[in-house]
Amino acid sequence: MLLASREIRRAPVRFGLLAGAIGLLIFLVFFQQTLLSALLNSFTGALQNQSGTVLVFSSEARENVEASVLSPDIVAKVAAVPGVGQAGPLGVATLTFLARGQQVDLAVIGAEPGKPGQPTKLISGRPATAAGEGVASAEAQGLAIGDTVTTAAGRSPVTIVGLTEQSQLSVLPTLFVAYATYMTLRKAANPDATAVLASAVAVIPSSGVSQQAVAASINATVPGVAALTRSEAVANAPGVSSTKGSIAIVLALAVVVVALVTGFFFLILTVQKTASLTLLRAVGAPASYLVRGLFHQVTLVLGVALLIAVGLLLAATATANAGLPLTIEPRALLTSTVVIVGLSLLGVAFSVWRVLRIEPVQAVSRPGLGGIE
């Protein structure tokens, strides 16, 4: 350990550049992972962060909440299924509003006050409980508590009484309102509509009943519907699986590159100092001591690289665009860190093999080491 640490102190530029290069690569992995989380939130954050743990769609909607239509009769049948504790209609639509003199598109989500479907990430203000009140997602730039928005025609005003976070839907900021307000907004946008139907039913199971059991019971009891747990509804939403798959490939390649860069650097370093390592073996240093020194250097370099990566990630998230807020998820970063460190240590396995192959007798068989030719 002493010799390994001394080598780093004698060549700080070499090891510093390596730590910086690996740190940039790890930052790339962390940033892409954070970006993936932000993108998924922008697609389905409003579904993920609402209080209903089971969502019921029309079976013809292919798990797309904006394409789903359910009649009041279906909503009542779902609420009557054994195991359903609470249930309420959920309306979802994209509408154009006037806010501070400018047009803005918002995903409107209507739920009956006190029933499932309420936003769970409220950061300020209060829930919308009365007609004409709304809770806007923080991604709706320029909207603040006390502001009033109207439909594009200047009708049906909605006053913002609260703000929520991580609640976008289909990459649009959201406006949570009471279901009665949702119906009013839909009629104002389409005066010729004869009725406003629910898009889904948000359900909370009875105490002691699992989400999966309630979803299965609804599917077996009510024809023409598809009941999914909240996590299933989020995973099956349009665009989610393709986004996950694309970024997962890039993440995997970046992790492999980090491991290869670390492994190749220490392999080159080991080859360059083979003569010194051979002398150490000749004077009695065990191979295990040299291997421990190698892993000590790798651990120090990776530790510094991780600090650099985390620092860059904090700076990037602090300056992110409000339209796509980046939130660091410690659990995901910890998982990535374990994978990166594990693969990097595996990447230096060839260097370890080189060290273990060094025999003390080579010190007396190499002229360059003072041995006999």
Q: Predicted segments — roles?
A:
Residues 163-254:
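Mechanotransmission and gating elements of multispan inner-membrane complexes involved in transport
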Residues 26-105:
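Hydrophobic, regular-secondary-structure patches
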Residues 1-29, 40, 357, 368-373:
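N-terminal Sec/SRP start-transfer signal
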Residues 90-93, 99-112, 118-188:
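Hydrophobic secondary-structure segments that place a key small or acidic residue at a functional site
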Residues 12-39, 242-278, 299-308:
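Hydrophobic alpha-helical transmembrane segments of multi-pass inner-membrane transport and secretion
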Residues 292-293, 297-345, 349-366, 370:
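Short helix-loop junctions at transmembrane helix boundaries
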Residues 35-45, 49, 64, 230-250, ...:
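Membrane interfacial helix motifs at helix-loop boundaries and amphipathic/re-entrant anchors
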